[in-house]
A protein has these predicted regions:
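Ligand-binding cleft/hinge of the Venus flytrap
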Residues: 68, 85-99, 133
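Central regulatory/effector-binding core of bacterial HTH transcription factors
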Residues: 1-38
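C-terminal effector-binding regulatory domain of bacterial HTH transcription factors
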Residues: 127-136, 140, 146-182
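Flexible hinge/capping segments at coil-to-helix
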Residues: 36-47, 52-77, 92
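Paired acidic/hydrophobic, glycine-rich loop segments that form the ligand-binding mouth/hinge
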Residues: 25-28, 121-125, 141-142
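Short, hydrophobic alpha-helical packing/hinge segments within bilobed ligand-binding/sensory domains
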Residues: 14, 111-113, 130
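Hydrophobic residues within well-ordered alpha-helices
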Residues: 69, 115-119, 134
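Short beta-strand-to-loop elements that line the ligand-binding cleft
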Residues: 7-11, 76, 97-108
Length: 182
């Protein structure tokens, strides 16, 4: 569609100063960005879910309450600041944060997805990432009544300069294409 526009994509879960790093923009979950940046929503809100393979659930059982996760093999998420993410669950206004026991720790959800598909344990995911695997039966969701809805993807860029034409076109394209159906 735009043959003269070049895109350089770098994937990282770290909070990057896109201006200092020489990038025009960054994309992340939620709208929290450094104060000198502008955030624009790219997607609808995203539900976060816990998924496991049918083999794992047959072998170790299905958790019925968040406390049950303490007795399961869980795949932990390492955040960009190297902290281990505490799973945030919510039901009827009640919030529950839990540090799960991690047999495996990953810093990218896609890496954890490979482990979960292989039966290594349970993991907390953005629902659109696992939806195709749930649909075809390779994964099952657990504790679905505790699945919170959080802010979706946002693109962020410097508020100190005019929006480059290429970046404006990219934003429009992403909003039109709706990646992951969002």
């Amino acid at each position: 569609r735009y043959p003269d526009i070049e895109i350089d994509i770098v994937a990282s879960n770290r909070m990057v100063d896109v201006t200092d790093a020489g990038f025009d923009a960054g994309i992340r979950y939620g709208g929290t960005v450094p104060e000198d940046m502008v955030a624009r929503r790219l997607s609808a809100d995203i539900r976060w879910v816990i998924a496991a393979s049918p083999d794992y659930l047959e072998r170790y059982g299905t958790p019925e309450h968040p406390d049950d996760l303490l007795h399961h093999r869980c795949i932990s998420n390492r955040l960009g600041d190297d902290r281990i993410y505490r799973w945030e669950l919510e039901r009827d206004g009640e919030t529950y944060q839990i540090t799960v026991p991690g047999s495996v720790t990953v810093n990218q959800a896609e890496t954890g997805l490979v482990a979960v598909l292989g039966g290594a344990g349970l993991m907390y995911f953005p629902e659109p990432l696992v939806a195709p695997y749930v649909k075809d039966g390779r994964l099952r969701l657990v504790l679905t009544e505790w699945s919170p809805l959080e802010e979706g993807f946002h693109i962020y860029y410097s508020s100190r300069r005019q929006l480059p034409t290429g970046l404006r076109l990219l934003i429009e394209f992403i909003q039109e294409a709706r990646p992951l159906g969002l």
